[in-house]
Amino acid sequence: MIVVTGIGIVSALGIGVQENYASLKSQKSGLDNIKNFQTTHNVPAGEVKYTNSQLKALLNLRESKTYSRTTLLGMLAAREAVQSANIGTGRVGLISATSVGGMDLTEVFYPSFEQGVTLDKVVHHDSADSTIHIAKDLKIEDFSTTISTA
C-alpha cells in the first residue's frame, strides 16, 4: 500500500506550497533568462531563482560541503513534505526520482578532468546520491530507492 501523506514543492514559481500556490493564483510566470548557470544560450527557462549557496543557507548546511543542485532542491521539498505529513519516527521509506542527478557538478568538473584534478565532485553524479543525502537529512534509515526519469 502506498500512502501520500505530505506535500513539498520547489519550482521556478517559488519555494514551498504556499508560495507556489500564490504564484499560480496570481498567474505569475516562472520563466526568465537563465542566471544560475553558465550557458551560451539566452533563452527563457523555468529556473529556481536561488543559487546553491543560498539554498544551503536556507537548509542550514555548511557552505564548504558539496551537494548537487538536485540534492539541495530535493531536501527543501522533502523537508516540507515530511513536516506537512507530521510523520513520526516510525518505519519510513523514501522513493526519490531525478532525471539529472549530480550532472551540474560533473559539467563543472569535466573541463579539468585531463589536468589531473581529483574525482571528488564526480561521486555526486549518480542519481542515487541525492536520495542518499535526502534520506540522511530526514533521518530515514529504512527503505530508500531512486527512480531515474531520464
PLM features: residue spans?
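Conserved "HGTGT" condensation-loop signature of ketosynthase/thiolase-family condensing enzymes
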Residues: 1-144
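Short beta->alpha junction loops
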Residues: 146-150
